[in-house]
């Protein structure tokens, strides 16, 4: 007898997987740069390593809360349009921020990426409050 599919999450895991895949090269760039330039701990006052560290670090600091909010939205029954829009905005925002912070010179990617991430935080948080508080 085959059991019914009990997966209740079908959208958020897509974005979590994409973000997990992105995290690999973001982190590997730091490690490879450290090995190449023989910088074991800290940033060795190396501007490039500092930027790579912050690009990867900011990803670690911002993604977990965002995906928890998306997971709660999905568990509470948010529509696919909400979830795909916010998931895509999060992924796009994180890529823009990473490219902006690790690139040469000031770029628009960093502020646009943070604005996108803050947008996901705000919209998802308000959606959850409105749903729970009725």
Where are these predicted regions, by residue range?
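N-terminal signal-anchor transmembrane alpha helix
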Residues: 7-37
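Physicochemical signature of membrane-embedded alpha-helices that form the seven-helix bundle of GPCRs
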Residues: 15, 53-56, 86-89, 113-116
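Cytosolic, membrane-interface loops and tails of multi-pass inner-membrane proteins
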Residues: 28-54
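Small-residue-rich segments of transmembrane alpha-helices in multi-pass membrane proteins
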Residues: 47-50, 112-126
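Core segments of transmembrane alpha-helices
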Residues: 57-70, 121
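Mid-chain, well-packed structural core segment of small domains
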Residues: 66-102
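Interfacial loop-to-transmembrane junctions
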Residues: 96-120
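Juxtamembrane boundary at the C-terminal end of a transmembrane helix
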Residues: 126-134
């Amino acid at each position: 007898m085959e059991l019914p599919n009990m997966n209740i999450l079908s959208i958020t895991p897509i974005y979590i997987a994409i973000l997990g895949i992105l995290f690999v090269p973001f982190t590997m760039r730091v490690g490879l740069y450290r090995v190449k330039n023989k910088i074991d701990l800290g940033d060795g006052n190396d501007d490039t390593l500092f930027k790579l560290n912050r690009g990867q670090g900011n990803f670690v600091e911002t993604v977990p809360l965002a995906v928890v909010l998306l997971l709660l939205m999905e568990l509470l029954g948010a529509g696919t349009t909400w979830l795909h829009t916010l998931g895509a905005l999060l992924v796009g925002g994180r890529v823009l921020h990473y490219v902006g912070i690790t690139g040469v010179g000031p770029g628009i990617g960093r502020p646009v990426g943070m604005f996108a991430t803050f947008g996901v935080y705000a919209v998802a948080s308000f959606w959850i409050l409105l749903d729970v508080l009725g």
